[in-house]
Regions:
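Short, glycine-/Ser/Thr-/acidic-enriched flexible segments
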Residues: 46, 76-77, 105, 129
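A C-terminal functional module that forms or caps the active site or interfaces directly
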Residues: 80
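Short glycine-cluster motifs
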Residues: 1-67, 72-75
Length: 155
């Protein structure tokens, strides 16, 4: 919830997930829980296992036309970087920025950080910085696509 507040303050709106995305998420969620955005995947992980949930959820969310960027909050003790190879491919193919806020310590933290950064996914150990960087990436992309060429003449 704090992340959503920070995203809102930074001008990054929360996407409304499409029906196909919600259906794909529903495949890995427990029967008693309906998926939404933000995607609370912990119950899904307990129900379907981390690899299946991350791979299913990340693919579905990245392919949703309403989603233009992704913030992940990852607990490093239960994840390995090989789970994110498809995400890195989708990130490049779809041109959607992805950032990760990592929670953890020690070797597992350092290993996951290195694996994600090798895949071109920036990582942060502080939520505010993660959100600020994503907002800056989005502003840069928006400003780059809306600039008009300069002719040297004034109106």
């Amino acid at each position: 919830i704090v992340t959503i507040d920070l995203l809102e303050e930074a001008g990054v709106p929360l996407a409304e997930l499409g029906s196909q995305t919600l259906a794909a998420l529903g495949e890995v969620y427990p029967p008693w829980m309906s998926p939404s955005n933000p995607a609370d995947i912990w119950p899904a992980i307990e129900h379907s296992g981390p690899r299946k949930v991350y791979e299913t959820a990340l693919k579905a969310v990245m392919e949703d036309p309403a989603v233009d960027s992704l913030v992940m909050h990852l607990f490093t003790s239960m994840i390995d970087g090989s789970m994110f190879a498809e995400l890195a491919r989708l990130k490049e193919e779809l041109g959607k920025p992805v950032v990760a806020w990592l929670a953890g310590v020690g070797d597992t933290f350092r290993t996951l950080r290195s694996e994600l950064e090798d895949l071109g996914i920036p990582t942060f150990d502080e939520m505010q910085r993660c959100v600020s960087v994503l907002a800056a990436i989005r502003r840069h992309a928006r400003d780059s696509t809306h600039k008009q060429p300069r002719t040297g003449r004034q109106g």
